[in-house]
């Protein structure tokens, strides 16, 4: 049986694996986890510097009152959740967020807005903040996550100095209607294609534990491969009280490791980022996940606190991994 995993590794390294082989990884017995992690880490080493690891950070730049009904989200206006609701913060606070990111070692900083799409006025304010970050020579790459913004706005953000846009597909096209009804999966897909047309780097991720099947997970992994996205944030559902998914059962850590491995075997040259829910889901297996990935989101999430940054520092130190410097990322 072990030879099958080595054969899949060789196929992934030299060509591409099939959906059946991807499902084989997900359905593997738990006793093969050490071998799966080893081969996945080995595959990562073929395309990346195995000793380098990146931190990224975000700011909840506009919070709550979102018009969309994403069943996993605390910021939807459809659910009564205990979050702060506010409009886009001012330029000074956006700049301060970049400085905080640098202070705890982040190389990328994403300004995230709750809404279906940022308004023209909001895009202008984001541009002003990015220009100020550049003017102050703050050594961090700036990313934006602002919904289904159009090509014209994307070009403005690029001109201001934004290097990457985040827009998540979240789950497979087949399962998406079970999670969101106020917009379509294809609308999100079109946004990613517009990001690529604008010549910006693409960051598009997934949330696991929404109720999707292994087949849904594999389907989305192949979509990202076909798109050629640069970075894939891997999130694990953190059930939020008063949302439709509040009672969803958390994923097992070992299943999460298999999912990460499967995404790496399909998207071998994409950056894989450990993001929301990593603390609760991975637990003591955090280090194994880090060996298979390139980066993690540090310093907290949109409406939830993250892991103590000192624990992430210690984890990388124990694994003999080096954080990417700002100069290596801000090219």
Curated annotation (Swiss-Prot):
The free-text note explaining how the cofactor binds reads: Binds 1 [4Fe-4S] cluster. The cluster is coordinated with 3 cysteines and an exchangeable S-adenosyl-L-methionine. Binds 1 [2Fe-2S] cluster. The cluster is coordinated with 3 cysteines and 1 arginine.
Q: Where does [2Fe-2S] cluster bind?
A: 110, 143, 203, 273
Which ranges carry the Radical SAM core domain?
48-278
Query: What keywords are annotated for this sequence in UniProt?
Result: 2Fe-2S, 4Fe-4S, Biotin biosynthesis, Iron, Iron-sulfur, Metal-binding, S-adenosyl-L-methionine, Transferase
List GO molecular-function terms, semicolon-separated: 2 iron, 2 sulfur cluster binding; 4 iron, 4 sulfur cluster binding; biotin synthase activity; iron ion binding
**Cofactor section:** [4Fe-4S] cluster; [2Fe-2S] cluster
What pathway is it annotated to? Cofactor biosynthesis; biotin biosynthesis; biotin from 7,8-diaminononanoate: step 2/2
Entry EC no(s): 2.8.1.6
Task: Kindly indicate where the leader peptide sits in this chain.
Answer: none
The family database entries (SMART domains) matched by this protein are listed as: BATS (SM00876), Elp3 (SM00729)
Q: Where does [4Fe-4S] cluster bind?
A: 66, 70, 73
Output the GO biological process annotations, alphabetical, semicolon-separated. biotin biosynthetic process
Catalysed reaction(s) here are:
(4R,5S)-dethiobiotin + (sulfur carrier)-SH + 2 reduced [2Fe-2S]-[ferredoxin] + 2 S-adenosyl-L-methionine = (sulfur carrier)-H + biotin + 2 5'-deoxyadenosine + 2 L-methionine + 2 oxidized [2Fe-2S]-[ferredoxin]
Subunit architecture: Homodimer.
**Protein name as it appears in the record:** Biotin synthase
């Amino acid at each position: 049986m072990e030879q099958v995993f080595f054969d899949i590794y060789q196929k992934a390294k030299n060509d591409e694996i099939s959906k059946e082989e991807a499902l084989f990884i997900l359905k593997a017995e738990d006793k093969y986890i050490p071998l799966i992690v080893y081969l996945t880490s080995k595959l990562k080493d073929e395309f990346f510097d195995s000793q380098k690891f990146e931190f990224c950070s975000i700011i909840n730049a506009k919070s709550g009152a979102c018009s969309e009904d994403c069943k996993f989200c605390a910021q939807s206006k459809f659910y009564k959740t205990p979050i702060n609701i506010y409009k886009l913060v001012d330029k000074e606070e956006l700049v301060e967020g970049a400085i905080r990111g640098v202070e705890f070692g982040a190389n990328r900083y994403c300004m995230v807005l709750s809404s279906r799409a940022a308004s023209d006025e909001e895009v202008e304010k984001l541009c002003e903040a990015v220009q100020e970050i550049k003017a102050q020579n703050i050594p961090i790459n700036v990313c934006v996550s602002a919904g289904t913004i159009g090509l014209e706005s994307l070009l403005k953000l690029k001109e201001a100095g934004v290097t990457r846009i985040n827009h998540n597909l979240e789950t497979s096209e087949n399962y998406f209607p079970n999670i969101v009804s106020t917009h379509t999966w294809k609308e999100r897909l079109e946004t990613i294609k517009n990001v690529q047309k604008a010549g910006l780097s693409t960051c598009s991720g997934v949330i696991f534990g929404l109720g999707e099947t292994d087949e849904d997970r594999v389907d989305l992994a192949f979509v990202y491969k076909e798109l050629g996205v640069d970075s894939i944030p891997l999130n694990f559902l953190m059930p939020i009280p008063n949302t439709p998914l509040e009672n969803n059962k958390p994923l097992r850590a070992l299943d999460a490791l298999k999912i990460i491995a499967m995404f790496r075997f399909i998207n071998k040259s994409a950056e894989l980022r450990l993001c929301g829910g990593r603390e609760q889901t991975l637990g003591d297996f955090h280090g194994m996940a880090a060996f298979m990935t390139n980066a993690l989101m540090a310093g907290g999430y949109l409406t939830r606190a993250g892991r103590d940054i000192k624990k992430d520092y210690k984890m990388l130190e124990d694994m003999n991994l080096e954080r990417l410097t700002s100069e290596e990322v801000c090219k």
